[in-house]
Amino acid sequence: MHRRNGDALSGAAPTLAEPAIRLLSPADSIADLTTLLHRAYARLGALGLNYTAVDQSPEVTRQRLGGGTCYVATLADRLVGTILVHPTYATNDCEYFTRPGVACIHQFAVEPGLQGGGVGRKLLARAEQWAREHGFHEAAMDTAEPATHLVEFYARLGYGAVGHVQWPGKVYRSVVLGKPLVA
């Protein structure tokens, strides 16, 4: 896609306005956040990957936010990205996420027309900063193993495979990725 004059969502990274990264606020719409997740994960859903964010309800979005810290990227007062960091993720399915000192990153999404423009890198950097500020020595996340473009993107940002997990109800195996956090 080509950037139309003044259209930040046309497919090119914004040049005049940079998205603001901030904490999710009580004034932010959970329905809008959920719709952003649906748009961002639609390509993955079309590949047959049943990520939770493909079709989760606003209630599920709200539940997933519980116990975590959510950052959003906004552009012209519109939500264009999000990331959720948990101090530790309580699960019986992935031992790595329960390790002391590991902050877990979930629900990471960027407006499709802005992907590749640095919004995701800024969100991820902010989540990692939060983890360092709160005494965590590593960040971890997972993604579908068949989503090789995502695995490669995270590898470029310093994340390496540390294991695998088969989440209940998912049609794919996830690769668990970890990154040491340097102060």
Named regions from a protein language model:
Residues 20-35:
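A short beta-loop-alpha structural element at the N-terminal edge
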Residues 34, 38-63:
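Conserved GNAT-fold acetyl-CoA-binding loop/helix
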Residues 72, 78-87, 104, 109:
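Conserved beta-strand in the GNAT
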Residues 88-105, 115, 137, 171:
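A conserved beta-turn-beta hairpin within the catalytic core of GNAT-like acetyltransferases
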Residues 108-115, 144:
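A short, internal acetyl-CoA/4′-phosphopantetheine-binding micro-motif in the GNAT/acyltransferase core
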Residues 122-138:
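Conserved acyl-CoA
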Residues 140-151, 167-171:
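Conserved beta-strand-loop-alpha-helix junction that forms the acyl-donor binding cleft
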Residues 154-164:
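Conserved acetyl-CoA-binding loop of GNAT-fold acetyltransferases
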